[in-house]
Amino acid sequence: MKHPSKEKVIFHVDMDAFYASVEQYDHPEYRGRPLIVGGASGKRGVVSACSYEARKYGIHSAMPVSWAKRLCPQAIFVPVNMRRYQEVSRAIMKIFDDFTPEKIQISVDEAFLDMSGTERLFGPPARAALLLKERVKTATGLTLSVGIAHNHLLAKLASDFDKPDGLVFVKKGEELAFLDKIDLKDIWGLGKKTLETLHSFNITTVQQLRETDISILQKIVGKAAGDFLYKASRGIDPGIYTERVKNRSISSEVTFEEDTRNIEGLHKTLLHLADQIMFRLLEQGYVGKTVFIKLRYSDFSTFTARQTLKHPLRSEEEIHKIALDLLKKKWDNHSLIRLVGLGVSSLEKKGSHQQIELFCDAADQHSKVENAVQIIRSKGRNINKASLIPHRKNGV
């Protein structure tokens, strides 16, 4: 039980190189070697994740696999095994739930935990974070990084500051000192294009950013980005995550390491997000009727779009198709995208208000497949759909 606390305590918990770390845990022969998790190895494949050993070669997520092979030909390349990652994620999220019911899950490997008032249960924040790290390491063999602060923005920046296996606590009154230690490029959400624009005006540090008048920032990078950077440079939370309504939707999102307009990469990302969301809907026993997407562009402007159906969503394919339609309507195919999010809302417990249908259409068949996948998955067996498995030529 939580007890009243005068001060917010927010943890941002981020698994270290999650997909790659799961593969290295499952395959000891991969440990200590550059490992790349991604799609097809041809020109159109995209890196989904990579180990820290691979990052030393300049490899990052959303990079074409062909580029990664040129940068590090000796790397190990493995396909995405989303069901396995979801299995590990479920175990991790259950541990998080043991620490607080106030959890905002951002993706399979990342969450905000509101630990306000839990000191009587777990001790001071730093001690609670160490206990959390130990629990996860014991249960899964994986490491994570924890950022602790009084708001979501600072907690996120803190978790990124000392990866991997880090623990950084930004106490009240120490915000500016902490911010001045980080590189300007590491301000969360700051894309390459915006960074280049700031550099062209000789704004190269967080302190210089903070000393720049907000009206000038807005003229340089636009109103939305100017407002965001003005607040971020002062450690003020822009409210990106605090406005979420708990238990009203299931969503996931991805922030790209480099702004992108790669349409195939965006489609593949939305497919992975749809798979994650459908898995969580089935696991938690919910159905939903509304699909929504979120796009954040390189100038920090953020847009959402949604579509509500008359019937509950019944498959990952249905969610993905609607997401692609919304993307097509909302995106001009030219603006650089920094973040893409996907979610399902208008939730209700499965079977609570569903009408009996006379005929079983294709969507119903997809729904049955989704449920079968969940049953197999619940028995500890890995299973992936063909759409999430890299294509191979000549049946090899």
Where are these regions (language model features)?
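Surface-exposed, charge/polar-rich loops and edge strands
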Residues: 177, 259, 348-351
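DNA-contacting surface of Y-family translesion DNA polymerases
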Residues: 3, 12, 186, 194-337, ...
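A glycine-rich phosphate-binding loop feature that marks nucleotide/adenosyl-phosphate handling sites
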Residues: 148-153, 233-234, 287-297, 339-348, ...
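Short, charged/polar surface micro-motifs in flexible loops or helix N-caps
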Residues: 18, 41-44, 298-301, 347-349
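Gly/Gly-Pro- and Ser/Thr-rich, intrinsically disordered tail segments characteristic of DNA damage-repair
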Residues: 1-228, 234, 241, 363-396
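Short, hydrophobic beta-strand segments
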Residues: 111-117, 304-307, 349, 354-359
